[in-house]
Swiss-Prot record:
It catalyses: uridine(38/39/40) in tRNA = pseudouridine(38/39/40) in tRNA. One of its GO terms (molecular function) is tRNA pseudouridine(38-40) synthase activity. Formation of pseudouridine at positions 38, 39 and 40 in the anticodon stem and loop of transfer RNAs. GO terms for biological process: tRNA pseudouridine synthesis. Homodimer. Its EC number is 5.4.99.12. Signal peptide: none annotated. This is tRNA pseudouridine synthase A. The active site is at D52. It comes from the Bacteria. The keyword Isomerase applies.
Length: 264
């Protein structure tokens, strides 16, 4: 039996999220079903991060065990032939037995897309969060810098968070505007449940002028999520990259925001 890893991209609009749930359509369920149809084996997959309902992924990483002997090309073409149009296997490789899609990851990056215009986006409405009030991007940038480094992010965790520690390290937060779209990228060692959406929600309130630039510092000091009541819509959120130690030889995902901007 060998261990394989796969890179997956998906649109999350039609799903309850990544994780399999009874009587609800999930991405994990569809991927495992496609693996079964292709291989004839009942395969359990393990992911880098369980995305919520309507959250997308430019790169999700999974691993699984199999006895089936197929080329990587056959795995990609075969499994994709059984998947819905909005889920796609991008690559498959053999990995060392010590590799784990979640626990071997050393960092993750999320992208959030805001459409900041008086009218909603007709084409991209399912892939961004519409904010009709003009946002002060400079205030958002200044506030975001307060979160860089190692902090207790208790104020930004979701109510269902079960993490043993609420300390996380944010390496950078980049906020860019292109036409009427605002892109927020956050790279951290890991994220708490709903942490990304809650950070974005509060940044938006700061951008609207409803909260001061010091609001992020106040939330870090308070360490209580009852004060952070602003959570951004999941449809604007993308898991955009997962990072691993070089010795696992996981394919690098060269996502460049400037290429993403060309879509718009």
């Amino acid at each position: 039996m060998k261990k394989l890893a796969a890179g997956i991209s998906y649109q999350g609009n039609n799903y309850c999220g990544w994780q399999s749930q009874k009587n609800i359509i999930s991405i994990q369920e569809y991927v495992e079903l496609a693996l079964f149809k292709f291989s004839g084996e009942k395969i359990k997959i393990y992911c880098a991060g369980r995305t919520d309902a309507k959250v997308h992924a430019l790169l999700q990483v999974v691993h699984f065990y199999t006895d089936i002997k197929r080329s990587y090309r056959q795995w990609i073409l075969g499994v994709n032939s059984y998947l819905p149009y909005d889920i796609s296997i991008m690559w498959v490789i053999k990995v060392h037995n010590n590799f784990h899609a979640r626990y071997s990851a050393i960092a993750k990056k999320y992208l959030y897309l805001i459409h900041n215009n008086i009218s909603r986006s007709g084409i991209f409405r399912k892939y961004c969060f519409n904010v009709f009030i003009s946002l002060n991007i400079n205030d958002m940038k200044k506030a975001a810098q307060k979160l860089i480094g190692k902090h207790d992010f208790s104020s930004f965790k979701g109510s269902e968070c079960q993490s043993k520690t609420t300390y996380r390290v944010i390496y950078y937060i980049r906020i860019n505007k292109y036409k009427e779209y605002i892109f927020v990228e956050i790279k951290a060692n890991s994220f708490l449940n709903h942490m990304m959406r809650n950070i974005i929600g509060n940044l938006i309130e700061i951008g609207k002028g409803k909260k001061s630039k010091e609001w992020m510092s106040e939330l870090l000091f308070l360490k209580n999520n009852k004060f952070s009541i602003f959570s951004a819509d999941p449809k604007g959120l993308y898991l955009s990259n997962v990072y691993y130690p070089f010795y696992f030889n996981i394919p690098k995902f060269n996502f460049k925001l400037k290429n993403f901007l060309k879509i718009f």
